[in-house]
């Protein structure tokens, strides 16, 4: 990856053992710096350890803060998943570049998000800070992988592209398989071209639960990008 000028993001899936993660934070971040990693995606899937604590308890809120503090010492960016909803701390800690803290695209593989979900988040979850929604589904029919499957993602390719403008995150993901992008290189070019940070944002039209259309001016550029998402209607 380094020889091709490609940066990697390390994933620290703690399996909800927050106490164990804190014991190894220094060692983990030192390893990252030694190998050229400057960003980490943290995860907390499962029941929190210490027992009796919850993802949104005071102890865990302080834990997320401790992780970001320690990461800042090593000049490492944090993209936290399964964490508490942001409350503006990304302005104090710019290395806390994004968080999940709501139902993201991964839920399309677990029953799906309602189509209106993405028209509501900009007025709720996004008020606290950037979200790693992880858009980019190009193959929406699951029978492509399993001939007996009748499931599908509640989205369209065009909507997935619109999410890169509507859903603000300075660290964007492309969640599908490379082979699915290779079949739609024209659409994938938009993901490569779209900015991830902005100088100006204008909401062109919106109705929570129905639709939102957003225009954003790329940071340090005169280029504007326009994206929109709707519900099932």
Predicted regions and their residues:
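Alpha-helix capping/termination and helix-coil
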Residues: 71, 75, 170-174, 195-198, ...
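Catalytic cores of secreted or luminal carbohydrate-active enzymes
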Residues: 158-207
């Amino acid at each position: 990856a380094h020889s091709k000028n490609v940066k990697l993001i390390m994933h620290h899936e703690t399996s909800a053992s927050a106490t164990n993660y804190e014991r190894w934070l220094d060692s983990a971040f030192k390893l990252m710096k030694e190998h050229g990693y400057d960003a980490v995606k943290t995860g907390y899937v499962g029941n929190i350890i210490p027992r009796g604590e919850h993802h949104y308890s005071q102890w865990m809120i302080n834990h997320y803060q401790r992780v970001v503090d320690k990461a800042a010492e090593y000049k490492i960016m944090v993209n936290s998943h399964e964490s508490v909803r942001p409350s503006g701390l990304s302005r104090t800690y710019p290395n806390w570049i994004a968080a999940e803290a709501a139902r993201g695209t991964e839920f399309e593989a677990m029953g799906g998000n309602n189509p209106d979900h993405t028209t509501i988040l900009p007025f709720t979850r996004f008020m606290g800070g950037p979200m790693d929604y992880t858009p980019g589904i190009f193959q929406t029919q699951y029978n492509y992988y399993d001939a007996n499957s009748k499931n599908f993602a509640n989205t369209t390719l065009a909507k997935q592209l619109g999410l890169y403008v509507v859903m603000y995150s300075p660290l964007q993901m492309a969640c599908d398989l490379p082979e699915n992008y290779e079949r739609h290189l024209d659409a994938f070019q938009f993901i490569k071209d779209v900015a991830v940070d902005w100088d100006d944002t204008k909401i062109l039209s919106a109705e929570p639960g129905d639709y939102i259309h957003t225009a954003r001016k790329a940071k340090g550029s005169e280029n504007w990008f326009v994206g929109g998402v709707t519900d099932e209607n």
